[in-house]
């Protein structure tokens, strides 16, 4: 396992669409493990493969309920609406309010290649949407309805 460098805004890899994983081999599992390690080191709640310069549809998330590894994640259902503050490891120091679904259902493959589904609400729904956006080259700043100033940022926990 290795810590990977997190690509920052301006790096074109963040604007590219990641390709589906066609074979879950040891290379893919190593990338997932590196992503998890990199996410934890940076105190993030999620990371998409684009952020470490890999254009494959891989996401890791941990909102405090354990590590989720998602291969080829896809939103299959969404419901409601929430507006909340969001940040991104690729855009340090910026926090913006983003409108997201209140609840989402995501279909994905686990590391054994088994098809699974996860339902997320609130922070988990937000993290799932944020990371899947990354796989499509979309950043939260594209969707932010308002950016927070320094004083407001101190009162908000970044996600
Ligand atoms: Zn991000």
Swiss-Prot record:
Q: Does the keyword Metal-binding apply?
A: yes
GO biological process assignments:
co-translational protein modification; translation
* Cofactor stoichiometry and binding remark: Binds 1 Fe(2+) ion.
Q: Give the annotated active site.
A: 131
Gene3D superfamilies membership:
Peptide deformylase
The entry's keywords: Hydrolase, Iron, Metal-binding, Protein biosynthesis
Q: Which InterPro entries match?
A: Peptide_deformylase, Peptide_deformylase_sf
Q: Catalysed reaction per UniProt? A: N-terminal N-formyl-L-methionyl-[peptide] + H2O = N-terminal L-methionyl-[peptide] + formate
UniProt family annotation: Belongs to the polypeptide deformylase family.
Q: What is this protein called?
A: Peptide deformylase
